Amino acid sequence: MLAPARKHVLVRMPGELKRLLAEEVRRTGDSLNDVAVGILASRFAVPFDPSGRPGKEPGKSGSVLLRMPPELKDKLAARAVQRRRNVNDLIVETLTERLGKEPMATTNGKVRRSDDKVRVAIIGVGNCASSLVQGVEYYKDADPEEFVPGLMHVDLGGYHVRDIEFTAAFDVTTDKVGKDLSEAIWEHPNNTIKFSDVPKTGVTVHRGMTHDGLGKYLSEVVEKAPGETDDVVGILKETNTDVVINYLPVGSEEATKWYTEQILRAGCAMVNCMPVFIARENYWQRRFEEAGVPIIGDDIKSQVGATITHRVLASIFRDRGVRLDRTFQLNFGGNSDFMNMLERDRLESKKISKTNSVKSVLPYELPDTDIHVGPSDYVPWLEDRKWAYIRLEGTSFGDVPLNAELKIEVWDSPNSAGVVIDAVRLTKLALNNGVSGALAGPSSYLMKSPPVQHNDDEARDLTEEFIRKHPRKQVKESAKA
């Protein structure tokens, strides 16, 4: 099958940008079109096969004709409308941002970042952090040829689970700050299941920023560590951290935005596991693009949790021609997140995230009065277990009612740890290959509220394609004249 014909876009370029493009052509030996379109395709996550033609100096004309995939042209047009500017200006800005400063991928690999490890920092040493740290230890010797529950691949794009190395951690409670990460993960109020011993990591938990990270009820059972907030940016730089995971409590809106600023200043990638919307927001997408670093977000999915199960059931109704009339999902748990969510104003973004994730699989709009998805109550004896009750009421052939109910019981934090292990390795692949901004495919597969919602099968295919196109080691063949 022939590839779709490329579309032509005539771009008016300032002299300084043409000079930068000429320098890149000389440096890489690639054609001007391959350089420029390659940058645009990388920025907007569109597949692009370079021509391999040798580079030529750009001509004296003030305009350059770019030949690009139709999908890229469509994405540029859509983003231009979104940002209220024309396509020409968007192309010039994107190329200038990338060529006007040293790309992060170059500094990642050559100056301060290690290509052989995925260096990870954690914000919030709670149950999820505990399960993640245990999981990396538990699967460090896993056979890449064997199936491991909860992981896309033991070896993902050239990175094994054991290639994940923890470099820094931040928390605000006296029980955790100042302790080795391997000890802090067992401290109060953490109460998730233990499935692996963890040796000393050599990573001391630093005093982080509180802001709105501790809610009213959680503040009654933990004590804030004394002292000033440690130098987050300096620590991330000194430890050569690649990726920062946001594990702050639900409702930490201001704290998440503050940490996001520190992550950008440090030049790190981000995996936003919380339902504070960063990756899906245009403003933050642009900030990560400008910084030259990737982000996966927002709000981590579980391996098999209440929301993914709810999505599948709603999809079955859709695919089998049953009209979904109303539905609910009620969640109960005994961890600190459920305690935090006793404050109803802290769970607004969580409720929006879970609701949108379910509604996105339907081809029609379900009124807000007919869908309720969200945390319901805190039950201390459940500890880190979560119970979810799901009900769907629909109309089938002959306008006959069809109803379905399901109960699911999980250990909440281990249920998402494998997903995060995949997420940090995917962001590392993006860093290595100079891909910046929100990673659309991986975010859709791994997160409840991504920038773009795809159905689960399509999202996985996009993520697998991302891995194939951005492996750890790439050998570039010499272009033939």
What are the residue ranges of the model-derived segments?
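Short Lys/Arg-rich basic patches
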Residues: 1-13, 46-68, 77
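N-terminal glycine-/serine-/threonine-rich beta1-alpha1-beta2 phosphate-ribose binding loop
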Residues: 106-259, 347-352, 388, 397
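NAD(P)-dependent Rossmann-like dehydrogenase/reductase catalytic/cofactor-binding core
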Residues: 418-481
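Surface-exposed, Lys/Arg-rich phosphate-binding patches that contact polyanionic backbones
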Residues: 14-34, 70-89, 93
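Rossmann-fold dehydrogenase core element
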Residues: 287-300, 321, 325
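Active-site-lining helix/loop region of Rossmann-like oxidoreductase modules
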Residues: 123, 162-165, 176, 187-190, ...
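Short, basic amphipathic alpha-helical segments that act as recognition/interaction helices
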Residues: 30-52, 85-107
